[in-house]
Design a protein with these regions (language model features):
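Solvent-exposed alpha-helices and their adjacent loops that cap or buttress functional pockets
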Residues: 49-52, 123-126, 185-187
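Short, surface-exposed beta-edge/turn micro-motifs
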Residues: 54-55, 128-131, 191-192
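C-terminal helix-cap and adjacent tail motif
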Residues: 15-19, 90-103, 190-223
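Short, Lys/Arg-enriched N-terminal segments with co-localized hydrophobic residues
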Residues: 1-10
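Generic N-terminal amphipathic, Lys/Arg-enriched alpha-helix
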Residues: 14-29
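Small-aliphatic-rich amphipathic alpha-helix that forms the alpha element of a beta-alpha
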Residues: 39-45, 130-182
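Glycine/small-residue-rich phosphate/adenosyl-binding loop
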Residues: 59-141
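Short loop-to-beta-strand entry elements in the cores of soluble alpha/beta enzymes
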Residues: 50-61, 171
Length: 223
């Protein structure tokens, strides 16, 4: 038993899979480098086409992350929304079904009255003690993005299995120029996604749980 994402570990895969959720406010408890290293090592077990493993992790913690957070907050105060290396697609560019899911999420935020609070914690990088910024070379195969998604998902699952919470978010990478300066990320690489890691706090934002589509709308069988 135990409480998900707050230090307890699990061996049951179904429990890990169904209990993991996005943590939007982390506690002040630090995460050791050994745990972070093991999380990345485990994530590397994700499947990769022809074993390309076209990914790299820049892990920001302590003073470096504090400086990045301060710059993000300063830019937010100026109204600078930034733009990630992969851009920000407009909602209308997504399918009708995806737009329905997005609307449901925004309705949930509105119903809970936490929209403004959520924007604030995003600017603070969710108060995470560690953020993994995941990159791959510019011009890499589109298949490599699929691999990187698997790597990211595996990272979040193994983090939860080790008692940590996580969230993968666009807002973590919306100021790539700041990240390149502090983490020495070359211009030849795209900063694809960030994954915040840490221990879950008691904040009510962490009680937000989205629903998943019914399987009958997701899968089509041949008869």
């Amino acid at each position: 038993s135990g409480f998900p994402g707050r230090g307890e570990t699990y061996m049951d895969f179904d429990l890990v899979l169904r209990s993991r959720h996005s943590v939007r406010v982390f506690s002040e408890k630090p995460v050791t480098r050994d745990i972070l290293r093991k999380i990345v090592e485990d994530a590397g077990r994700a499947p990769s086409w022809v074993n390309a493993q076209e990914w790299h992790v820049y892990m920001a913690t302590e003073k470096t992350l504090k400086n990045i957070r301060a710059e993000y907050m300063a830019l937010a105060e100026k109204g600078d929304q930034g733009m990630a290396d992969y851009g920000m697609p407009h909602r209308e560019e997504w399918s009708k079904l995806a737009q329905e899911h997005m609307a449901g999420f925004h309705n949930l935020i509105a119903a809970e009255g936490v929209g403004q609070t959520m924007a604030g914690v995003e600017d603070m990088l969710f108060n995470a003690p560690a953020v993994a910024f995941i990159t791959m070379p510019k011009g890499a195969s589109r298949w490599a993005v699929l691999d990187l998604g698997g790597f990211t998902q595996t990272m979040q699952l193994t983090a939860f299995n080790k008692g940590l919470g996580s969230i993968a978010a666009y807002n973590l990478v919306k100021h790539p120029e700041v990240l390149r300066r502090y983490l020495d990320i070359p211009e030849t690489d795209d900063i694809v996604v960030g994954v915040a890691l840490g221990y879950e706090s008691d904040d009510k934002l962490n009680q937000l749980h989205t629903v998943r589509e019914l399987v009958v709308r997701v899968v089509s069988f041949d008869h």
